Every structure is written in structure tokens, then in C-alpha cells.
């Protein structure tokens, strides 16, 4: 039975609690609502599976706090997490929580208040050097393209670049309808470069690179007890 998500709100704040299970949830809610802060509730006992969604959320360029939920179960399993390296590699704030015991919720709420609307995020993204180079080129084109001027105030240039590479229909529709952007032809040359290098569709290329990145992070920071392997 899954635990309930941490749901307390500090006095003087308002907001809604939305459970996002997959990438479709990101498109359906976050793109439309454009929140000031995202609290990403992660099952600490199954980090690798859960951190893929975290990676997608990070691409949005919004303030994010990762709540490592079920942390009481994590400790019972005798798992060990190198928190310092985890924070450094992930590039996000983390808080250990348990919705069942309410452990860490006060810290989570305090961080949420302080982190909301944070501007100097300076997130670092890394898939691999080849892909990163193409994404950076697209970012530069987006930033210098006057038709994207309003869009990059709401969405990070990194996120726009990645989603345009992936031909994300939801985002393209928003860019067309909300921002009046109609010319995306400059993306194709970058898609072709990636397809030639990897002999695969751009969406699959990026997905596999994200999974590889997550796997690498978990391998470096997580130690599981021998009896639970």
C-alpha cells in the first residue's frame, strides 16, 4: 500500500497538492499551471526507478525540493546514502521524510517556504558531451530568437530545447497558442545530427541518456545491505 504524500501546509501559505506519476502528468499540470515550487516525493527504497521523473522535473528549471519518502523503511533495509555526493550529483535540495511517522515534514515545509520563487537555481544538466553540445546550441538559438522572448520567461531555455528535440506535441501547442510561435524548423538540423550519431529517434536517445545518468548517480551514492541485494 503506497504511503500518503506529505500534505501539511504552513500557516500563511496556500496551494494545491497534485500527485504526478509520470511524464504525462508534467505536461498536463505543470506546463499549464507554471508553479513557483515543486516538491518531488520520491520512494527512497527504490531510487533508480523514481529519479527518472526527478530528472524530467529538473529540466523545467523550477525550484524543486526532493522529499525522500519512506526513509524509515530505507533505514530498516540498512541502506546507506552518501547524502553529500547525492545532493552534488543531483543538484537539488533533498529532505528525508516519512509520511507515516511524519518524520522530516517540518524541515520540508521550512525549506519549501525559503525555496519558493528562488531565482538563482543555476541547474547543471548532463546527459553526455555530444548530446549536451547539441542542446546548448539549440538553447543559444532559442535565446537569440525574438519569437521566444516571452516563452523563456516562463520556461527554461534548456527545457524548451529538450522538448523541441523530442517533438513534444503538448509543448509545441502551448508555444503556438500562448506565445504565437510558429517556426520550429531550426530544430530539424539538430535532430538529424543526433539521429545520425545514434541511429535512433531523438526522443529515445534522450530517454536512454537520462536513464543512464540516473543509474550512474545511484551507483555512486547508494549502498544496499548484502542481505537485501
Regions picked out by a protein language model, each given a short descriptive name:
Residues 21-95:
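Conserved C-terminal guanine-recognition region of P-loop GTPase G domains, centered on the G4
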Residues 72-127:
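Canonical P-loop GTPase G-domain recognition
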Amino acid at each position: 500500500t503506497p504511503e500518503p504524500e506529505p500534505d501539511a501546509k504552513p500557516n500563511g501559505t496556500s496551494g494545491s497538492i497534485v500527485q504526478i506519476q509520470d511524464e504525462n502528468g508534467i505536461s498536463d499540470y505543470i506546463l499549464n499551471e507554471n508553479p513557483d515550487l515543486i516538491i518531488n516525493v520520491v520512494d527512497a527504497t527504490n531510487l533508480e526507478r523514481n529519479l527518472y521523473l526527478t530528472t524530467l522535473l529538473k529540466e523545467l528549471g523550477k525550484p524543486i525540493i526532493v522529499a525522500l519518502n519512506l526513509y524509515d523503511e530505507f533505514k530498516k533495509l540498512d541502506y546507506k546514502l552518501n547524502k553529500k555526493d547525492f545532493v552534488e550529483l543531483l543538484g537539488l535540495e533533498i529532505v528525508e521524510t516519512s509520511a507515516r511517522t511524519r518524520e522530516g515534514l517540518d524541515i520540508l515545509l521550512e525549506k519549501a517556504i525559503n525555496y519558493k520563487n528562488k531565482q538563482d537555481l543555476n541547474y547543471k544538466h548532463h546527459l553526455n558531451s555530444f548530446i549536451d553540445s547539441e542542446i546548448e546550441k539549440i538553447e543559444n538559438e532559442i535565446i537569440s530568437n525574438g519569437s521566444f522572448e516571452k516563452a523563456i520567461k516562463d520556461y527554461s531555455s534548456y527545457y524548451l530545447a529538450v522538448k523541441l528535440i523530442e517533438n513534444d506535441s503538448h509543448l509545441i501547442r502551448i508555444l503556438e497558442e500562448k506565445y504565437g510561435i510558429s517556426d520550429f524548423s531550426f530544430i530539424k538540423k539538430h535532430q538529424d545530427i543526433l539521429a545520425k550519431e545514434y541511429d535512433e529517434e531523438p526522443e529515445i536517445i534522450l530517454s536512454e541518456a537520462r536513464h543512464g545518468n540516473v543509474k550512474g548517480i545511484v551507483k555512486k551514492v547508494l549502498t544496499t545491505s548484502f542481505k537485501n541485494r
